[in-house]
Every structure is written in structure tokens, then in C-alpha cells.
Amino acid sequence: MAADESVFLRAKDRSYKGLTEDEQKEWSGPFYFIQAADPQLGLMKAWRIGDCDSGGDEWDEEVQLTKQAVQAINKLQPKPRFIVLCGDLVHAMPGSPFREQQIKDLKDALRGTDPHIPLVFVSGNHDLGNAPTPDTVEQFCHEWGDDYFSFWVGGVLCLVLNSQFFFDSSGCPELMEAHEVWLENRLQMAVQTPSRHVLVFQHIPLFLRTPDEEDDYFNLQRGIREHLIQRFKRAGVKAVFSGHYHRNAGGCHDGLDMVVSSAVGCQLGDDTHGVRVVVVTENNIIHRYHSLDQLSERGMDEDLKKLLL
């Protein structure tokens, strides 16, 4: 069973097995990865019946959508360098009924992923609780690996953050402080260590449209947001990828691209179930949301594929 779980536990000791600086520091040419968000097993029925505060007692739809995503990604040629799931893996909050089974069923669906494609997990509010505690963070790490860490892919430095600490760290101030010390260290390293690009992955967006927008459930509080943007720009961060909104959104600000991707699972707007294809070239990050049906039937868009040549 331990070996069976290892695919979900590669993020350890604040790094990621197989995607370390020693192994992946050098630029090796254009590549792409897949960003997915919010499979959130259990939300679709809960949203339909207006009972989102419960854990969601049915999730067959989300399981099938996750399997469709996995099958479509497995068929892509060339293969993506990794898949990152940007939080809200299941709907049931820590300690809620159905949570254990939702996690099991999501893992079963994800086990179909080509073993050559690493799975990177980001923690969301439904994974940790809106106000995380040491216990809920420990539970997440037990199931999915570290809640924050860095990794390298082909000369690109990637930072996975626990954005719930930015939202409400009142239940775990010491963990928040450790995260802050680590993040500052990583951002300083980004300045001092040559990399082709620096990318950030977190669940909650910095902003949905513009950095000066009003505070909202779906973005980070303005003071925190502005401070992070300043730090990210100083460190040369090119793009921040998130989910949480269950709609596509985002915008560029002074060279920083805030990318908000809609969900594999429940849609709260006019988008459809999908994932984002992200192409990394020597000078640019180019990305486009693909519906699961499109990805299944036609694969990634040809103009994106040509960028890999």
C-alpha cells in the first residue's frame, strides 16, 4: 500500500522527488504542463440543491470528469512535464462526513495518470478548512504531501504556496510564520539563483481582474495581495496560477500574469469543465484553457504545440 500511495507523496521536505534543483536546474528547451483546479468531489450536487455547507453526499460526476481529464492528458503527445492541481481536491471539509471516501475516490481516479507525468498538489480551503489548524495541515500532508514546497522543471523554478495562511492563519500562527520564513528564503533564492522563469501555484487568486479590486471571498485581502505582488515582482515571478473561483479570470499587472483557471468539477459561471495548457518557452509563458471535451477529441491546440518545436 505504501508504494501505491507514493505517487501522491512526492512533495516532502519542501521539495519534490525527481524535480529538484540538482536534476532540473538547466534550461532544456520549450515544454508544457497542465494546470487543473477544483475537482472538488461532492460540490456539483451540493450546489444544485443549495446545500454547499454540507460535505456533499454524491460525487460520481466529479469522478467521471477527473477520469476524463486523466485519459485526455494521457493521450497528449508530447507528454506534459507535470500536472498541477491547484486545490480543493474534495468538497467535504476536514472532519466532515464523506471526506475520507471522497479522497479515496479521487486518488483512485488519479491513479490512472501516466506514471511518467508527475502529479503536483496544491492545498485549498476545502482541503485545510477556511481557518486551518495544525491538525488539518497535518491531515493534508499525510494524504497529499507537503502543503508548500519548491521544485524545478527544465530550468524553471516553481513555488507551491499554502494560500490559506494568507486568508486566515488565526488557528496556526506558528505554521504561518514558518511558511513566511520559507517563502522569503525562496524569493531571495530566486533573485540570486539564475532560472529561466519563476512560477507560483496557489489556490486563492491574488486578484480576479485587477490588483486594486475590492476584497472578495474569491481573492486575497488587498493589503496582503499588494504586499505579495511587490515581493513576487522583485523576485522576478512571471506568473501566478490559481483556482478557487470556478470560472476563468485573471489579468496581467506590470509583467506579472495572474492566471485564474476554472474547475475540473463544478462550474459557477459560463465556462465548461476543463484544464489549462501552459507552454513555457525561453522568453514567455503562453496558456489557454481547454475544455475536457476538446482535449479528449482534438488534444491541445496546434498553435500551442508548434511552440514546442
UniProtKB/Swiss-Prot annotation:
GO MF terms held by the record: metal ion binding; protein serine/threonine phosphatase activity
GO cellular component, one term: cytoplasm
UniProt region (Catalytic), positions on chain: 47-250
Positions annotated to bind a divalent metal cation 2: 88, 125, 244
Keywords: Cytoplasm, Hydrolase, Metal-binding
Enzyme class: hydrolase
Keyword set includes Hydrolase: yes
Membrane-traversing stretches: none
InterPro entries, alphabetized: Calcineurin-like_PHP_ApaH, Metallo-depent_PP-like, MPP_CSTP1, STPP_CPPED1
EC number annotated for this UniProt entry: 3.1.3.16
Binding site for a divalent metal cation 1: 51, 88
Catalysed reaction equations from the record: O-phospho-L-seryl-[protein] + H2O = L-seryl-[protein] + phosphate; O-phospho-L-threonyl-[protein] + H2O = L-threonyl-[protein] + phosphate
Signal peptide: none
Predominant cellular place of this UniProt entry's protein: cytoplasm
Lineage top rank: taxon: Eukaryota
Cofactor(s) the record lists: a divalent metal cation
Protein name: Serine/threonine-protein phosphatase CPPED1
Organismal lineage: Eukaryota, Metazoa, Chordata, Craniata, Vertebrata
This protein's encoding gene: cpped1
